[in-house]
Amino acid sequence: MRVSDFNFDLPDELIARYPKTDRVSCRLLQLNGENGEIFHRTFSDVLDLIDEGDLLIFNNTRVIPARMFGRKASGGKIEVLVERMLDEHRFLAHIRSSKSPKEGAELFLGEDKLGENNGIKAVMKARHSSLFEVELSDKSTALLDVLQTIGHMPLPPYIDRPDEEADKECYQTVYSKVPGAVAAPTAGLHFDENLLEKLKAKGVNFEFVTLHVGAGTFQPVRVENIEDHVMHAEYVEVSQEVCNAIIATKKAGKRVIAVGTTSVRSIESAALSAEEFGNPDLIEPYFSDTSIFIYPGKKFRVVDCLITNFHLPESTLIMLVSAFAGYKNTMNAYKHAVQEKYRFFSYGDAMFINKNSNVRGLE
């Protein structure tokens, strides 16, 4: 399979640069993965699509204000995007500057907010491929506190505008809990507290995994054949409680519904681990990095339904959706979404998909 197989034409005006003020009012394209049928709905209709006893799996990661602006000691401007927090004072980051900082170079962060010559001092300790290991010089202040003071919400590049005060709330799920993501698990942005309460009242069960979404989620696939692509790693936590709930749901004949591709990758990583290590259970606890890459031809061991946004052309995320719903069904649904002027990407509209259990490759 070629990357170009997953391309589609998207008018620029369909890229959502601001969210809906009412989270549940976005549009919802329902796709039957078994036969390709499409229904046009509103997101609040998920209440009618999810049954009593079904299990919703959410990703409770919380987006950190991971983008910082500053300068090198030489005076050159830098933009720092935290990729992963290593401890309270060290982090891995992408750094944009005219010249990459060398090991031992001093950085002064946050001068856009703190004023010239008042930046927070940090040191570039080492380079790991495309990432820079950076350490705060002042050990009396934790990294999260620094980010809350000087950081900007790391809006995706396609939103193409500076972050605003409202993004601190809008680019965050209402159930986010564990800080560490540099991109939101965007399918969850459509749920508000009222909808969650209605789902609970209906008898729908909830469980939470944690996958700290990295900036790699926006990186293009740079190979021609998708089988040659090396997936970026992200940290995942799937607890025993989550595993027990999934097993009980399956035994009861109910559905496991993943909210977002990150929830899919978390659950399927834990299920793949169980299979590879000969665990007789369907799934086992998982606390590790995952580089799982799901594309057409790969099987799904756990997930029955998927709630997801509309993704970038030629991205690993549209490949995952194609594996889940079938390639032809997915590309046809995207064609319909463009024709019907759905809003795309992080602040855009959503899909509700039930799995095609028979797909193989580009079918």
Curated annotation (Swiss-Prot):
Location (main, coarse): cytoplasm
Catalyzed reaction equations: 7-aminomethyl-7-carbaguanosine(34) in tRNA + S-adenosyl-L-methionine = epoxyqueuosine(34) in tRNA + adenine + L-methionine + 2 H(+)
One Gene Ontology molecular-function label: S-adenosylmethionine:tRNA ribosyltransferase-isomerase activity
Name of a matching Pfam family: Queuosine_synth
Alphabetized NCBIfam families for the sequence: PRK00147.1, queA
Keyword Metal-binding: no
EC class name: transferase
Lineage top rank: taxon: Bacteria
Record-linked InterPro entries: QueA, QueA_dom1, QueA_dom2, QueA_sf
Protein's job: Transfers and isomerizes the ribose moiety from AdoMet to the 7-aminomethyl group of 7-deazaguanine (preQ1-tRNA) to give epoxyqueuosine (oQ-tRNA).
Annotated pathway: tRNA modification; tRNA-queuosine biosynthesis
Similarity comment: family membership: Belongs to the QueA family.
Coiled-coil regions listed in the entry: none
Gene Ontology cellular component annotations, sorted alphabetically: cytoplasm
Location of the protein in the cell: Cytoplasm
GO BP: queuosine biosynthetic process; tRNA wobble guanine modification
Record keywords, A-Z: Cytoplasm, Queuosine biosynthesis, S-adenosyl-L-methionine, Transferase
EC number: 2.4.99.17
Listed name of the protein: S-adenosylmethionine:tRNA ribosyltransferase-isomerase
Assembly mode: Monomer.
